[in-house]
Amino acid sequence: MPFPRHRRGFTLFELLVVIGLIAALSLVLLGGLGGGGKSAALQSAQAVLANLVSAARTKAQADGGGTRLLINIDPANTADPSRFLRYIAIQTQVAGVWQSATVVDIYLPEGVYVVPGNFASIPAGLFSTGTAAPWTKSDSAPLRSTALRANQIISATINSPATEQWVSVGFAPAGTTAQSGDIILAGGHPRAPGSFAPGESPVELENPETIRGLTLSAYGLPTLINDRASF
């Protein structure tokens, strides 16, 4: 008599994603109970981002193919402006071809955005000018996500009918990356409709003093960074 076949268990990749999202949700709930507000949202976003990086790295190693983390940097999507600097996806590469279906896609918590890299063009109005502190690092360099490189900007249609601009962070089958550097998160808010011109940023980042993020090593390993002075 044949025994019934049981469904397979979670893969390591799936467990990483689930555990990370549960941890991030816990931070939001605890922060909400304690009145943490934006600080809790930043902590949650940091946990989500680190988990996505680890998941992309693990997936590359498990499949023996490349993966990439994609961050939406397109300010012109009027159909869903909430994707700008908040929507992140993981794609896999099979036989040298990037697969259109994403293995993971998620929005960062509301009110938290990825700070762009040193791109040739950054939409006007993104960085608040109403803060006493400038948008610079401790060494006076611009406060930018150095792991997000201008030469890794692509146009792609991902979970939307629109073709948008994305910046990618790639992982090799060994789990390594050629894009070591920082990925910075900052609090912000959508700008009021009609208050900005086409092509300008639909969101405004609020305060360079309250940021979090991570530093990505060449081995693809994230290290959490909790304040501006540490970037």
Describe the function of each predicted region.
Residues 20-21:
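Residues within membrane-spanning alpha-helices of integral membrane proteins
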Residues 2-3, 10-13, 28-58, 62, ...:
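N-terminal helix-rich module
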